[in-house]
Amino acid sequence: LSRYQGLIYRKKRVGLLFDLNKMSNELSKAIQQLKKRQTVNGSWPWFEGMPDDRYITQYIVTGFGHLDHLKIKNIRENGEVMEMVQRAIQYLDNRIQEDYEWQLKHNKSKLNNNQLGALQIQYLYARSYFKDVLLAEKNKTAFDYYLKQAEKYWLPNSRYLQGMIALTLNRYDKTAKAVAIMKSLKENSITSEEMGMYWKENYERYFWQEAPIESQALLIEAFDEVANDTKSVDALKVWLLRSKQTQNWQTTKA
């Protein structure tokens, strides 16, 4: 019996090694595709030949941040990848500067009002993975403005964006506010033995910032990193697994 179990174990190990090698090869191919499709200004389009797109560029930068954060790939030790990321971040820093300049020109008397949108929140979150990448002096005022906006106006946003804000603020040492956001998220959640922990808004909607699977996954990250709440993390994972069992996940990111 022990010999048979050992054989099964070794087969599983070989299978795991094959999967890891497959993942590594696929990741290398994806990186080469991204390098090929990155435009001269550092952005990425949705598809080759299309105009640059801010959302997809932030999406890709966040993806690289996740790979590094989860230690799947050390981005900073890969010069080719880090150069792509730095160029993309420079593009995104310039776009946030454009947002701020638009507010100064058209909304100067209302700068203290809520001028925070989903793209600005996504930018702050993507940028928080790469604090070591230089933020040009010319872009610092714009960055600080939107970071303060996120700290002040987090509540009207979707659960997904609230989680992004909590993670961002925590990484920029605004811990008290980040913890307060996590407390609010927990208080507004639903927990059951069968379905785990989730929110009543967890159903498919139109906008990317309301996607339920992506929201749940990001909130797992937030409850782990910001709240250090393993019990909630486990309960959140239950909902995610139940969702996978009962329906097809609707998006590529899911």
Where are these regions (language model features)?
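Large, well-folded core regions of big proteins
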Residues: 1-254
